[in-house]
Regions:
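Cysteine-centered iron-sulfur cluster-binding motifs in ferredoxin-type domains/subunits
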Residues: 1-17, 251, 278-279
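Iron-sulfur cluster-binding electron-transfer modules in prokaryotic oxidoreductases
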Residues: 19-354
Length: 354
């Protein structure tokens, strides 16, 4: 019941047993036996689509007296949590299909539906960094509606395997021309993007998914690899902070990607980088939003993450690439975490102003 899908078991078990995958199967069987998943589970698995259509409900939850308590009774959302709000200007509201130098290295920036709607500034920062690095950036989006592509990860985590397979299959098909052209597919949200390297195989999506898995890469991985090869020309200046305190997303750690995160942050002049020795933040997507899970969620965060964040001074920025990690950090400490793309964008702006 308390599996948060961190995949630490797969990393640490000598036989690489993936308990997160077993938990997905158990949830799927449970919903099948019940005749379907509860409404709250289905809504949380499609949050961006729900917010676009019924965003007024989220606003009423905050505005009406007792709105949070009512939402807890009806949807299971803990009244102590603040749910993500839709941005006034989503990323795809004003972006062309491709941007950057015509002769630059061609890459794909996959802006998922959550990043597009809830944190478009992260996508804009990543785009600015890639363009500054000389890339020609392709920005795929669905042709049949607003926003970015759903990856299927929230649905899969909830045990809604049919929905997850449908969403993932559409994404694989949309990216197939880019994969065939040899373009790296760059992602921003670790759990969503690393699904392309792992969980797609579980959904049985064939050779196209296998090919995509080999070209899916996180932003910090690409930048670290290019820098190590001597090919990265990114004009970075100092940032307003002296130290970056980094919380690694569970899936970054499970896939051994924290060295890439540290190497990318190390490109910023004068910035000391320190990683918090902590496990899961406890939010884990929709897990920490649910009232039944709130005590466990906060206990996980209080084990190491939140005490370290509270001790950080004003000269320290908190870096966390996971969207739900940043939500938990803010909820438990009042501090704002930032995606590495935003910190790199600040370093670009600093260099241009000097």
């Amino acid at each position: 019941a308390w599996c948060v899908g961190c995949k630490a078991c797969k990393r640490e078990c000598p036989q690489a047993v993936d308990l997160a995958a077993l938990a997905v199967e158990a949830r799927a069987r449970r919903w099948q036996a019940r005749g379907g998943a509860p409404l709250a589970v289905r809504l949380l698995a499609s949050a961006p689509r729900l917010v676009r259509r019924l965003g007024v409900l989220a606003r009423l939850r905050e505005a009406l007296p007792g709105g949070r308590r009512l939402a807890q009774r009806v949807f299971g959302l803990d009244a102590r949590r603040t749910v993500p709000r839709a941005a006034r200007h989503p990323f795809f509201a004003r972006q062309p299909a491709e941007i950057g130098a015509a002769g630059g290295r061609e890459v794909v920036l996959l802006v998922d539906d959550h990043t597009d709607l809830f944190e478009p500034d992260v996508a804009r920062a990543a785009l600015a960094v890639l363009v500054a690095a000389g890339c020609r950036v392709h920005l795929p989006r669905p042709s049949d509606g607003p926003g970015g592509y759903p990856t299927g990860k929230p649905a899969l985590s909830a045990g809604l395997v049919v929905q997850a397979r449908r969403e993932a299959a559409a994404l694989v098909a949309a990216l197939a021309p880019h994969v065939a052209a040899g373009r790296p597919v760059i992602g921003l949200e670790p759990s969503f993007h690393l699904m392309l390297r792992d969980d797609l195989q579980m959904l049985g999506l064939g050779d196209a998914a296998a090919s995509l898995s080999r070209q899916a890469i996180l932003l910090e991985e690409l930048l670290a690899a290019e820098a190590a090869a001597g090919r990265l020309a990114l004009p970075l200046g100092p940032v307003p902070w002296q130290r970056a305190l980094v919380h690694g997303h569970c899936h970054q750690k499970a896939f051994g990607l924290m060295p890439a995160m540290q190497a990318t942050l190390g490109l910023i002049p004068g910035l000391a980088v320190e990683t918090i020795d902590a496990g899961c933040c406890g939010m884990a997507g929709a897990f920490g939003l649910q009232a039944d899970n709130y005590p466990v969620s906060m206990a996980m965060a209080e084990d190491a993450l939140l005490p370290a964040v509270r001790q950080a001074d004003a000269a320290t920025c908190i870096v966390a690439n996971g969207m739900s990690c940043r939500q938990q950090i803010h909820h438990g400490s009042g501090r704002e975490g930032m995606h590495v793309a935003l910190l790199l964008q600040a370093a670009l702006t600093s260099r241009r102003s000097t």
